[in-house]
Amino acid sequence: MSPMAERLRSIIRDPGRIRRAEPLKRHTSVRIGGPADYLVEVADRHELSRLLRLAGEEALPVYILGSGSNLVVSDEGVRGLVLRLTGEFARIAVDGSTVRVGGGCSLPKLAHQASRRGLGGLEFACAIPGTVGAGLVMNAGAHGGDMAQVVAEATVIWGDGRMERLCPGEIGFAYRSTRLQGTSAIVAEVVMALRPADRAALEGAMRQHLNRRRATQPLQYPNAGSVFKNPPGDYAGRLIEQAGLKGERVGDAQVSEKHANFIVNLGQATARDVLTLMDRVRSTVERRFGVRLEAEVKIWGHNPWFPP
C-alpha cells in the first residue's frame, strides 16, 4: 500500500469507500473521463475536514463529484482527490416549510420529497439530474425557477477546513452562477424556505416538466446536459441551430439533432472530441452572430479549449 493510500485509510476506515485510479467515465452522464488518482466517498464533516487537511499538506487538488451530469472530464483524468459526498451529506430534514438538506442529496429526490409533503418551490428541480451542492454553486434552474428563489442559507467548508454559514447575498446568485464558482467552497448543507402548496398541483407541474424534458432532450444518448449558457435575451440552442450545426460531429461526439445545445456521445466519444466540437460551435456562432457563447458544463483536467 502506498503512503498516500495508508493516510487515506487512516481517515476512511471502510476500504470500499476509497478507489484508486478510478475511471471517471463510470461516474459522468456523458460516459467520458479518464482516471482519478483517488475517488473517495465522504460520509460526514469530520472525514471531510481531515481529507481537506491532508490535501493541503500534500498540495493535492480536490474535486467534488456530484451526479456527474453537467461535467466533462479530460481523457487524461485528474490528479489528487475526487470526493463524493454521502452519508450525512445526503440527508433531508423538514420542519414546517423549512428544509435542511445535505449538499450531496439528489435534486430530483429532494423535489419529489418536498411535493409529497405539500411544499412548493422546487418543482423546477425535478428534472435537473444533479446534487443540491452543485446546483447551488451554479444556481441551477429550469422552467422559470432556480436555486436563488429557495435558498435561505448555506453552510460551506472551505479548502482550509473552515466552516462558514452564508446568506443569499454572500452566495451572490446570478444567472447560472454564484460567487462560489471557482473557489474552494464545498457545500455541506443548505437551508431552503419553501411554501405550502397543493400536493396534486405540485405533482402535476412536475409531470409536465418531466414530460417536456423527455420530449425535447436527447435522453437516449449519454450527454452532459446543456453545453452553453443562454446569452442575454436569446437561447444558445437557437443560435447553434440557426448556424446549421445540428448533427455536426467530431469523432463520436455530435451536436444533438433533437436539441442543439446538447452534445451527445454516440458510443466512443472522447473528451477531446467533445471539447473540439464545443470550440467549433462557439467559433461558428461567434462568426455568424457576433455572440460568444460561454460554457455551462464544468470541465476537469487538461483543457486548452475553454480555460477557467
From Swiss-Prot:
Q: In which pathway does it act?
A: Cell wall biogenesis; peptidoglycan biosynthesis
Q: EC top class, in one word?
A: oxidoreductase
| One GO MF term | FAD binding
Annotated FAD-binding PCMH-type domain ranges read: 31-197
Reactions catalysed, as given in the entry: UDP-N-acetyl-alpha-D-muramate + NADP(+) = UDP-N-acetyl-3-O-(1-carboxyvinyl)-alpha-D-glucosamine + NADPH + H(+)
Cofactors: FAD
Q: Which GO terms describe its cellular component?
A: cytosol
According to its UniProt record, which residues of this chain constitute the active site? R176, S226, E296
Q: What is its main location?
A: cytoplasm
Keywords in alphabetical order: Cell cycle, Cell division, Cell shape, Cell wall biogenesis/degradation, Cytoplasm, FAD, Flavoprotein, NADP, Oxidoreductase, Peptidoglycan synthesis
Q: What are its GO biological-process terms?
A: cell division; cell wall organization; peptidoglycan biosynthetic process; regulation of cell shape
Enzyme Commission code(s) on record:
1.3.1.98
Q: Source organism's superkingdom?
A: Bacteria
Localization annotation: Cytoplasm
NCBIfam families named among the record's database cross-references: murB, PRK13905.1
Family membership: Belongs to the MurB family.
- Function summary: Cell wall formation.
The protein's name: UDP-N-acetylenolpyruvoylglucosamine reductase 2
Q: What organism is recorded for this protein?
A: Symbiobacterium thermophilum (strain DSM 24528 / JCM 14929 / IAM 14863 / T)
